[in-house]
């Protein structure tokens, strides 16, 4: 399975692609960052992120996309930009009918380091080891995108099976009962 991980952001949107599957070691396909100047208007920055994500989706042709869930931050402006960039990636994947996994930072950290409280250096170190890279991807947004892709590679299939096994609830009815 090929997974595109997206670490959303307006200034730097990390993108990382890994291949892997049951019984196979994960391998790096590509990693990079879409950058936008802080001086540009938000609409222009979002368009640049959208175009970058579209280009990656068309070129690397992933089987799934993993996006970091936005978490609460003190800086509302930062969290808004992160949420908007994440939404752009989600819509791009949805338009192509790709499965989308959303993961909190602590879920991603736990998946790649064993601890949901790992710092950026620990995540970068483990991504480097897990993908057998000569050095940690830079900037940290790129390493985080690869960590997201690895998280989905390992957790996505199990989550999909759990969703498929859970009975659908009737819409608009609390608890799904009539």
UniProtKB/Swiss-Prot annotation:
Top-level EC class as recorded in UniProt: hydrolase
Location of the protein in the cell: Cytoplasm
Catalytic activity: Endonucleolytic cleavage at a junction such as a reciprocal single-stranded crossover between two homologous DNA duplexes (Holliday junction)
Keyword list, A-Z: Cytoplasm, DNA damage, DNA recombination, DNA repair, DNA-binding, Endonuclease, Hydrolase, Magnesium, Metal-binding, Nuclease
One MF annotation (Gene Ontology) recorded for this entry: DNA binding
Active-site residue numbers: 7, 68, 141
PROSITE patterns according to UniProt: RUVC
Cellular component GO terms, alphabetical: cytoplasm; Holliday junction resolvase complex
Binding site for Mg(2+) 2: 68
Residues the record lists as binding Mg(2+) 1: 7, 141
GO biological process, one term: DNA recombination
One Pfam family this sequence matches: RuvC
Domain of life per record: Bacteria
Cofactor(s), names only, from the UniProt record: Mg(2+)
Enzyme Commission number(s) of this protein: 3.1.21.10
Cited function: The RuvA-RuvB-RuvC complex processes Holliday junction (HJ) DNA during genetic recombination and DNA repair. Endonuclease that resolves HJ intermediates. Cleaves cruciform DNA by making single-stranded nicks across the HJ at symmetrical positions within the homologous arms, yielding a 5'-phosphate and a 3'-hydroxyl group; requires a central core of homology in the junction. The consensus cleavage sequence is 5'-(A/T)TT(C/G)-3'. Cleavage occurs on the 3'-side of the TT dinucleotide at the point of strand exchange.
HAMAP family, per database record: RuvC
Family, per entry: Belongs to the RuvC family.
Name of the protein this chain belongs to: Crossover junction endodeoxyribonuclease RuvC
Species, as recorded: Parafrankia sp. (strain EAN1pec)
Gene (UniProt): ruvC
